[in-house]
Amino acid sequence: NKALPFVTDEKLKEDVRGFIKQEAMHARGHSSATEEYLAARGIKTERNQKLMKWLFDVVLDDKPFGKKMPALLERRWLLARLGLVATIEHMTCVLGMYALENKKWDEINADQVMLDLIRWHGAEEVEHRSVAFDLYKHLGGDYLSRYYLAAIVVPMIIGLWVDGAANIAGQDPRFANKKPAVYKPWMWVEWFKASRKQLLPNPLWLVLQQLPYFSPWYDPAKEGSTELAQAYLDQSPAAMAAGAIAANMKVAA
């Protein structure tokens, strides 16, 4: 939203608006379906949610840690945050493609509602994979800054994912004695084990998939498959429900 007033390309501006709407819909979908699913199994997510809220509402706020940014640095701070989002969008595009192409989940009869929610989200991540990157470049983001931002963001995000998973695993009575934590080898070993069963992407594979983003010639349009994403969205119950809600909201407005 903060970047919209600086966008001079109308198509990009429309893409950014669509991106914002999609992310808002994802947030609502996850907060309702995922929380209900986990709550029914005695899993609490408040700690993970508070961490994310602190990260985005305090650390990455217009006024980080409540401190007003000097006027000369405001544009650079905006670009830095856009670069961060662009990096994350590449990572989620990779995971989106993994979710769309993983057949093992179907073979083991994974919960169909949750599976659809994950693939719907993944398909839309693939679909809008270029928006944040294009916006970053449009507003003057350079390669060197993108490179160093990605070098920080990639391990940070992977660490946050593992930390969140550890918090959830720690609430499972089966793993109580393990005391899961991001800094403990057990969590990473379990991730590798799950990846060998094709239940999760291999950690090393996931890291290698980030390497194209570090290239000066990186082009998000060449990553992922819009056709595969759109094909899933066309038949996804979650996507159709979200579309109906959006249409009703538009009519009501």
Regions found by a protein language model. Give the residues of each.
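Non-heme di-metal
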Residues: 1-253
